[in-house]
From Swiss-Prot:
Keyword hit for Thylakoid: no
GO molecular function, one term: structural constituent of ribosome
Gene3D superfamilies: Ribosomal protein S8 (1.20.5.1150)
GN (gene name): rpsU
HAMAP family, alphabetized: Ribosomal_bS21
UniProt protein name: Small ribosomal subunit protein bS21
Any one annotated GO CC term: ribonucleoprotein complex
Biological process (GO), any one: translation
Length: 71
């Protein structure tokens, strides 16, 4: 759980922004969204595998683009 200490004479908006940023870094909102509905283990594995395939394709695409640009 992210904890921030509100500094003296610090506006509420600034403290709230710091808290939101710390929550984002901790991944709390992403975790809440992921756990909002039950996901069957097979669906979770399928989604993770699809993400891995997408990452690999993106990596290969970047490498091929780099090779094309270098003459």
């Amino acid at each position: 759980m992210p904890i921030i200490k509100v500094r003296e004479n610090e506006p509420f908006d600034v403290a709230l922004r710091r808290f939101k940023r710390s929550c984002e870094k901790a991944g709390i909102l992403a975790d809440v969204r992921a756990r909002e509905f039950y996901e069957k283990p097979t669906t979770a594995r399928k989604r993770a595998k699809a993400a891995a395939v997408k990452r690999l394709a993106k990596k290969l695409s970047r490498e091929n683009a780099r090779r094309v640009r270098l003459y």
